[in-house]
């Protein structure tokens, strides 16, 4: 399946690398949300290639609650760091991941 340049990929199941990325930005997500998460499990994600990579990740945060994160991973030549650049609250498992 081809992807439009700058478009987002088809959803994929989260793996260990995506979970590590989420664990890394969890404190920033908690600060943004104004609360602590006992559960913070990556479920699915999509990517968008820009001058780096945007990861749009569905996170289970307990009960039926989910959040969507946009995590930007810089190119290695720019340090390769991670940045939480967006967060959507009040999501469900069924809500599709879309650009935000």
Curated annotation (Swiss-Prot):
Description of what induces expression: By bacterial infection. E.tarda bacteria causes significant up-regulation in head kidney between 12 hours and 24 hours post-infection and in spleen between 24 hours and 48 hours post-infection.
Tissue expr: Widely expressed. Highly expressed in liver and to a lesser extent in spleen, gill, brain, intestine, kidney, head kidney and blood. Lowest level in muscle.
The keyword Cytoplasm is annotated on this UniProt entry: yes
Keyword Cytoplasm in annotation: yes
UniProt motif (Secondary area of contact) ranges: 48-52
Pfam families reported for this sequence: Cystatin
Top-rank taxon: Eukaryota
CDD domains per the UniProt record, alphabetical: CY (cd00042)
Disulfide pairings: none
GO-annotated molecular function: cysteine-type endopeptidase inhibitor activity
Annotated GO biological process: cellular response to bacterial lipoprotein; immune system process
Ranges for domain Cystatin: 6-88
Location in or out of the cell: Cytoplasm
Keywords: Cytoplasm, Immunity, Protease inhibitor, Thiol protease inhibitor
Main location: cytoplasm
UniProt-annotated site: Reactive site, residues: 6
GO cellular component: cytoplasm; cytosol
InterPro entries in alphabetical order: Cystatin_dom, Cystatin_sf, Prot_inh_cystat_CS, Prot_inh_stefin
Role played: Thiol protease inhibitor. Has papain inhibitory activity in vitro. May be involved in immune responses against invading Gram-negative bacteria.
Family: Belongs to the cystatin family.
Protein name, per record: Cystatin-B
Organism of provenance: Oplegnathus fasciatus
Source lineage: Eukaryota, Metazoa, Chordata, Craniata, Vertebrata
